Amino acid sequence: MRGSGAKIAGVLPLFMLFIAGTISAFEDIERLRIWPLPAQVSHGGRRMYLSGDFKLVTEGSKYGDASGILKEGFDRMLGVVRLSHVISGDRNSSGTGGSALLQGLHVIISSSTDELEYGADESYKLVVPSPEKPSYAQLEAKSVYGALHGLQTFSQLCHFNLKKKVIEILMTPWNIIDQPRFSYRGLLIDTSRHYLPLPVIKNVIDSMTYAKLNVLHWHIVDTQSFPLEIPSYPKLWNGAYSSSQRYTFEDAAEIVNYARRRGIHVLAEIDVPGHALSWGKGYPALWPSKNCQEPLDVSSDFTFKVIDGILSDFSKIFKFKFVHLGGDEVNTTCWSATPRIAQWLKKHRMSEKEAYQYFVLRAQKIALSHGYEIINWEETFINFGSKLNRKTVVHNWLNTGLVENVTASGLRCIVSNQEFWYLDHIDAPWQGFYANEPFQNITDKKQQSLVLGGEVCMWGEHIDASDIEQTIWPRAAAAAERLWTPYAKLAKNPNNVTTRLAHFRCLLNQRGVAAAPLVGGGRVVPFEPGSCLAQ
């Protein structure tokens, strides 16, 4: 918001305010109660209080906020800060000390655009002054989306003073310089195995912002159901569980817009040629036969016309540069078992494996024609890696050592190795999520640059709207710090961050996120009465 009319006396440049030296001892780091841990932090020992009419000021910013993204983010930040208690104290009185009253936040953004581009600058610099300094905190960022991250960090500095019943910031002055380690920090949700209503998906998106995750991988369809409306082929959503468990095209556009305004990309996935039985509920011609319904019919041009129609429709609303085409767990026996397709294979002198390659590469060409770069699951690389389009990103989920091989071949990679980053593995504790290193055994800088980041996967076979949040959180937060915080700042022993993660879990609870206890694996119940800090 430009030109609020507020005057800011003596706001100092961020670099002049930055105190030399950063937090290094883990004992001190654990006192910070910030998650994920910023790149550089220094603080003092004073306190300030938030004014009752805490303001957003944008004088000097090139970003005009015509779309309201910054103002909405500021309002959300204040909302969660004030959510945990009723603020009944006089937040503007001398009782809090006039010089200790923080009047607002001065945000300066150097880019005038709010286009959400993959790889855009997400850095920010945050200064909260001491009581003797200017009465405005200052946040600088290259992009509005970096500023949103800064707002999240600012919200974690705010605490409720039980005696004065106002919001305070302890340990001022604060000086934080921060940016993400990886550009891709993802969370997968699966709406085929169990339908997730729109409010649930929006709640997941909101919770992602608290941990600075930035990609929602929407595994929309699979064998079990096809819940999304595709205007080009309107019978496809006949594969939904019921008419009430569907997403209209406008619903999908709303999810994309909701996420975008929070700095989150939406990666859409259609998993082909396997995992696609539900497609044939509306168009049986997509099946090899009525008795052999998966994978999709490789011999039929109609199959690829449908894929083209889906991706054409996707391109109207899913604006992320990538689309996910799956390609995993393809059992090709139906092709040889169906006489018509077996004859086609013979005519084209293809084995089942060669037909699998043909299908994946043809689907890739269709995606490229609609302006997308492609992500495929790792089986495509294992089976015919040298044939993949060079714009392919290989999504690792099976083999821990695959990332090294993918990057050595010159292809990009996303890490989701199931032994550590699959959230549906209920017995997997948060420590494994924290310790999982995307650069494991990769020391070459060029190969490291090809690792885009990582993603935790919330597969939907055994979760629905009733338990998705406590299955995701707090374990996803452990991975989020791995993907955000500089490697040198990460704890070598995950147990060293237990106190800070417990505070973040309590913070999620206070913000209405049903994050489970840390003790045990995922989705565990509290083992006895007690504080959320101890569980």
Swiss-Prot record:
It is an enzyme of class 3 (hydrolase). Expressed in roots, leaves, stems, flowers and siliques. Its main location: membrane. CDD domains: GH20_HexA_HexB-like. N-glycosylated. The active site is at E329 (proton donor). Keywords: Cell membrane, Disulfide bond, Glycoprotein, Glycosidase, Hydrolase, Membrane, Signal. Disruption phenotype: Reduced amounts of paucimannosidic N-glycans-containing glycoproteins in roots and leaves. Transmembrane segments: none annotated. Slightly inhibited by N-acetylcastanospermine. GO terms for molecular function: beta-N-acetylhexosaminidase activity; hexosaminidase activity. One of its GO terms (biological process) is carbohydrate metabolic process. InterPro entries: Beta_hexosaminidase_sua/sub (IPR025705), Glyco_hydro_20_cat (IPR015883), Glycoside_hydrolase_SF (IPR017853), Hex-like_dom2 (IPR029018), HEX_eukaryotic_N (IPR029019). The keyword Transferase does not apply. It comes from the Eukaryota. Its EC number is 3.2.1.52. Disulfide bonds join C292-C334, C506-C532. Optimum pH is 4-5. Glycans are attached at N92, N331, N405, N441, N496. Residues 1-24 form the signal peptide. Has a broad substrate specificity. Can use synthetic substrates such as pyridylaminated chitotriose, p-nitrophenyl-beta-N-acetylglucosaminide, p-nitrophenyl-2-acetamido-2-deoxy-beta-D-glucopyranoside (pNP-GlcNAc), p-nitrophenyl-2-acetamido-2-deoxy-beta-D-galactopyranoside (pNP-GalNAc), 4-methylumbelliferyl-2-acetamido-2-deoxy-beta-D-glucopyranoside (MU-GlcNAc), and 4-methylumbelliferyl-6-sulfo-2-acetamido-2-deoxy-beta-D-glucopyranoside (MU-GlcNAc-6SO(4)) as substrates. Belongs to the glycosyl hydrolase 20 family. This is Beta-hexosaminidase 3. It comes from Arabidopsis thaliana. The lineage of its organism: Eukaryota, Viridiplantae, Streptophyta, Embryophyta, Tracheophyta. The gene is HEXO3.
